[in-house]
Amino acid sequence: MSKVDLNKETGPREVFCGLTSIVWLHRRMPDAFFLVVGSRTCAHLIQSAAGVMIFAEPRFGTAILEEKDLAGLADAHEELDRVVNDLISRRPEIKTLFLVGSCPSEVIKLDLATVAEKLNSRFLGQVRFVNYSGSGIETTFTQGEDGALKALVPLMESTDDEKLLLVGTLANNVEDRFKKIFNNIGITNVESFPPRQSTELPKIGKNTKVLLAQPYLSDTVRDLKHRGCGIIQAPFPLGVEGSTKWVLAAAAAFKIHELKVHEVIAPLANRARQAIEKHKEILRGKKLFLLPESQLEISLARFLHNECEMELIEVGTPYLNRDLMEEELNLLPDDTKIVEGQHVEKQLDRVRASNPDLVVCGMGLANPLEAEGISTKWSIEMVFSPIHGIDQAADLAGLFSRPLTRNQILTSKSLATH
């Protein structure tokens, strides 16, 4: 195992909450609806993150808790029943309705599990109700997907069929390319979780081999293991290196020789490496500081160091599941500084002291750092962009080279005007 420098830090944090994950989950499952039980702040957050026009009809909404609800002066359960009835009558195409808890609903101890159970009885055969928490009190924003998938695992039927299960939301075109690669190497029974329709949950069992596409699904993985699924240990499919090793790990689990994998992947990998070169010219030798937010930080650091030759100052991550991240840690250079958790003020002090060329951080920190002359990249863009797979490696590198190019152009123009 790589001898990385592991550290833990606690204190004030700066992260989005798990409600943000609704933005990509509702796109993934168009027959589902996500009803947040929360405040007006919750509603503004999701609306802003999704960029949806006010007259559109998105597949998410907020049942707003008013002051009288929070004060216990009204029956929030009755009001929620009314909202759900109105929603189902207006949107009969909904097949699964997620009741999503928030910080306010958790503070007043609103029992959404019981609400979901009663609604399932009332709408039996028409709509399925599932509940999970998107609260940001103890979690970061990508863990909203973990909560949603964990809530679906008990609904997955059992099977003894041998299959590969890709777990974690992927862009549809990325998923299609992965399935084509797996089919070409001889793995033909491949399914995805979450599926493209919420009512088409894959069946699972002792012959299901799980290959994680996202690193932030610890609770979902735990429940899949309890159902008998095997977990394939692999790096995550970011960049040429990560994607190749990811496919090789799946091939090994199905006893397919690695030569077959390289035969299929080699042309893709060669094209991707050539496409990365123009970005590498910009990124090579640049100092990188990753602040914790998405749990993608370790995989991104590995890609940017190994394939783009960036220098890693510090790699922050909100949480570190060593079992899931072991293969990634093995690919990092020795003595890479990894900090689990966050004390945002101390980390910002280290950012300023290290004078990085690029900081990957949350939106709330980006503008203040830019005002200090430090180039930034929003970490939330990594989950809104199709970055997985060999074909996307150059696009992933481009997400990091563009801020540096922009900064060079702005600096040149500023000097020219003086």
Swiss-Prot record:
Q: Which key words are in the record?
A: 4Fe-4S, ATP-binding, Chlorophyll biosynthesis, Iron, Iron-sulfur, Metal-binding, Nucleotide-binding, Oxidoreductase, Photosynthesis
Q: Which coenzyme or cofactor does it need? A: [4Fe-4S] cluster
Record field: catalytic activity:
chlorophyllide a + oxidized 2[4Fe-4S]-[ferredoxin] + 2 ADP + 2 phosphate = protochlorophyllide a + reduced 2[4Fe-4S]-[ferredoxin] + 2 ATP + 2 H2O
What GO molecular function annotations does the UniProt record carry, in alphabetical order? 4 iron, 4 sulfur cluster binding; ATP binding; metal ion binding; oxidoreductase activity, acting on iron-sulfur proteins as donors; oxidoreductase activity, acting on the CH-CH group of donors, iron-sulfur protein as acceptor
Q: Which residue ranges run through the membrane?
A: none
- What's the Enzyme Commission number for this chain? 1.3.7.7
Its pathway is: Porphyrin-containing compound metabolism; chlorophyll biosynthesis (light-independent)
What SUPFAM superfamilies does the entry give?
Helical backbone' metal receptor
Kind of enzyme, top EC level? oxidoreductase
Q: Tell me, which GO biological process terms does this entry list? A: light-independent chlorophyll biosynthetic process; photosynthesis, dark reaction
Question: At which positions is [4Fe-4S] cluster bound?
Answer: 17, 42, 103
Q: Name one Pfam family in it.
A: Oxidored_nitro
What the record notes about the co-factor is:
Binds 1 [4Fe-4S] cluster per heterodimer. The cluster is bound at the heterodimer interface by residues from both subunits.
Q: Is Transmembrane helix tagged as a keyword?
A: no
Family membership, please give it. Belongs to the BchN/ChlN family.
Task: Quote the subunit structure annotation.
Answer: Protochlorophyllide reductase is composed of three subunits; ChlL, ChlN and ChlB. Forms a heterotetramer of two ChlB and two ChlN subunits.
Role played: Component of the dark-operative protochlorophyllide reductase (DPOR) that uses Mg-ATP and reduced ferredoxin to reduce ring D of protochlorophyllide (Pchlide) to form chlorophyllide a (Chlide). This reaction is light-independent. The NB-protein (ChlN-ChlB) is the catalytic component of the complex.
Protein name per the record: Light-independent protochlorophyllide reductase subunit N
